[in-house]
A protein has these predicted regions:
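Long, charged, mostly alpha-helical binding arms that flank functional sites
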Residues: 263-343
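Residue-level signal for inorganic ion chemistry
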Residues: 30, 59, 90, 121, ...
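Core subunits and conserved enzymes of cellular information-processing
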Residues: 241, 245, 249-251, 317-320, ...
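Conserved short loop/turn motifs at secondary-structure junctions
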Residues: 41-44, 73-81, 103-112, 135, ...
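A glycine-rich helix N-cap at a beta->alpha junction
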Residues: 86-112, 117-120, 125-128
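N-terminal catalytic cores of NTP/NDP-binding nucleotidyl/phosphoryl-transfer enzymes
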Residues: 14-91, 206-238
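Active-site cores that bind ATP or allylic diphosphates and position pyrophosphate for catalysis
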Residues: 72, 76-78, 84, 106, ...
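Basic/polar N-terminal segments that are highly enriched at the extreme N-terminus
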Residues: 1-14, 580
Length: 580
């Protein structure tokens, strides 16, 4: 298993430089006319996850830093898996992260140009129609140490391949009956050079072009040419595309054969993927989670999708902070999710509005406080931000407090509510606990205390020191709310490797393996919580800190009649302590 890596900020910045230095070197040498143009090329077959966010920050960040442009290009070459829903979701996620693309393109914009290029390759003897099955073609490719076997169709007459290629697109040829392959080198050590498939038949309607096309280009054939058509100067990809780069370059060479491309061609550079502990990020696995109901949709706050993080309460800046910390390298590492959560805490500490909420309530009665009296006390919205202002919170004789904040027989260093001990009620008074009431089962139903009227802010004894400060809400001036406590979706540190190991050992499908390692406690719903009324005035997705509990946000499903709050992250990394 890959070691957990938490790199120091200095080394992270240094690791990013290998890409920046390459770009700056090109600019100094006058390549590409001194311009920088990048692209973010997602396939619209699912929702973006935090791994895509790393690529987005690089693609858009490099362009911004050097006064260039980053375009958005949808790699829509597989109509069976693509949908307009995903297109719109991807655009929303990019904008939420704070970026705006220069132009919006689609690989389908170039279908005619790619088709014409494929025709030319057939005419030049560089491509042929192969009627073998996909299984046989794969077998004939050989291994990295053994050369492949040439297809019996490799030298089929050019006119015959041309005629069949046109039939592939006319609808006369069934899916899987034949493919178009580039004629390169079946003995090349790079497996991608062994006559790669560049076109196949897909009869499913395309979300943009309808039924115009039945023959569709493969990724390797469409990607580099699309970069070239758009004038991309720096094509930034993850490490698995290192072995694809020679093919990327070859197709561009063939496309512009006989012309000098040294100073005007896309340059592919690879960086490491984002791997995160306690997280699965393959779209295939995420789709399984959604389809099988193991999560509540793509934006379930337990999902590593950008929309899931947004709903959970992560801010764009917190994701940027995390990506800055891990940097970009040329080797894979498993990054500790605690580093992401730390970035979220750091950011939310400066922006979250502080409010009072009680999630496991027990009634606290101040026996010497006048019945019917209500005071409005000032509560600071954010002590880290003086400009955030304050709001008023009502105080009365009967309050809700956290059940965990009372102990009838407490140890010596217990500084919360216990008989005979004083604590301060946040923003209010110092009180002394006098006892409690229990039901027939011994469950505490009420806690009693007396208050010192001289200890409110501005009073003579306001600065009297006590060791414990507790939060509360007034019973008659609060709102009932549902609180959703989200935790890590997986029980194991590296679910990707664990999933593969289980499937190999049991010869089972992904779903069965997932059920073995999914965390059954990743969501706890608390329906009877109480929160101060001020929270109901805030818009959905507002960043909040429930004092002494953690960071939360208002869920998109929350209504005035049913308030719903999601836990974003705790105030401290309790998971790390539990699992030590």
């Amino acid at each position: 298993m890959t070691d957990i890596k938490n790199e120091e900020v200095a080394s992270e910045k240094k690791s990013l430089n290998f890409i920046e230095q390459a770009v700056e070197k090109d600019l100094k040498e006058g390549k590409n006319g001194g311009k920088v143009q990048t692209r973010f090329p997602p396939e619209p077959n699912g929702y973006l996850h935090i791994g895509h966010a790393k690529a987005i920050c690089l693609d858009f960040g490099i362009a911004e830093k050097h006064g260039g442009v980053c375009n958005l290009r949808f790699d829509d070459t597989n109509p069976t898996k693509e949908d307009v829903e995903y297109v719109e979701a991807i655009k929303e996620d990019i904008q939420w992260l704070g970026y705006q693309w220069g132009n919006e393109y689609y690989a389908s914009d170039y279908f005619q140009q790619l088709w014409d290029f494929a025709i030319r390759l057939i005419q030049e003897g560089k491509a042929y129609i192969d009627e073998q099955s996909s299984e046989l073609i794969a077998q004939q490719k050989g291994t990295p140490t053994q050369p492949g076997v040439e297809s019996p169709y490799r030298n089929r007459p050019i006119e015959e391949s041309l005629e069949l290629f046109k039939k592939m697109n006319s609808g006369e040829i069934e899916e899987g009956a034949m493919v178009l392959r580039a004629k390169i080198d079946m003995a090349n050590p790079n497996m991608h050079f062994r006559d790669p498939i560049i076109y196949r038949v897909v009869k499913h309607p395309h979300h943009r072009t309808g039924t115009t096309w039945k023959a569709y280009p493969m990724y390797d054939f469409a990607h580099g040419q699309s970069d070239f058509f758009e004038g991309v100067t720096h094509s930034l990809c993850t490490l698995e595309f290192v072995v694809h780069r020679p093919l990327y370059d070859l197709f561009i060479d063939w496309l512009k054969e006989g012309k000098d491309l040294n100073d005007n061609r896309p340059r592919q550079t690879e960086f490491n993927k984002l791997n995160l502990s306690y997280t699965l990020m393959s779209k295939r696995n995420l789709l399984t989670l959604v389809k099988e109901g193991l999560v509540n949709g793509w934006d379930d706050p337990r999902m590593p999708t950008i929309c899931g993080f947004r709903r959970r309460g992560y801010s764009p800046k917190s994701i940027h902070k995390f990506i800055d910390k891990i940097g970009y390298t040329t080797y894979d590492a498993l990054n500790d999710i605690a580093l992401l959560e730390s970035s979220v805490r750091d950011d939310l500490n400066s922006r979250a509005t502080r409010i009072s909420a009680v999630i496991n309530p027990v009634k606290l009665i101040i026996t010497n406080y006048p019945e019917g009296q209500v005071e409005e006390l000032e509560a600071i919205n954010n002590p880290e931000d003086p400009e955030a202002g304050s709001h008023l919170i009502e105080f009365s004789r009967e309050l809700w407090m956290e059940r965990e904040d009372f102990m009838e027989n407490a140890p010596k260093k217990y500084f919360r509510m216990t008989p005979g001990q004083e604590v301060r009620l946040k923003n209010a008074y110092i009180v002394k606990c006098t006892g409690c009431k229990k039901d027939e089962n011994g469950v505490i139903t009420e806690v009693y205390c007396e208050y010192d009227a001289n200890t409110r802010s501005g009073m003579p004894d306001a600065n009297r020191k006590v060791k414990g400060t507790l939060h509360w809400v007034s019973c008659n001036h609060c709102l009932q709310a549902e609180v959703r406590l989200y935790d890590r979706l997986w029980k194991v540190e590296n679910p990707r490797d664990e999933l593969a190991a289980i499937r190999e050992a049991k010869k089972c499908e992904a779903l069965e393996a997932m059920k073995e390692i999914i965390n059954p406690d990743s969501l706890k719903v608390l329906p009877n919580c109480y929160i101060e009324k001020f929270a109901a005035t805030l818009p959905p997705l507002s960043y909040l800190q429930f004092q002494r509990i953690g960071y939360f946000n208002i869920d998109k499903e929350s209504t005035p009649d049913k308030l719903i709050f999601n836990r974003t992250v705790g105030l401290k990394d309790t998971w790390g302590k539990i699992n030590k």
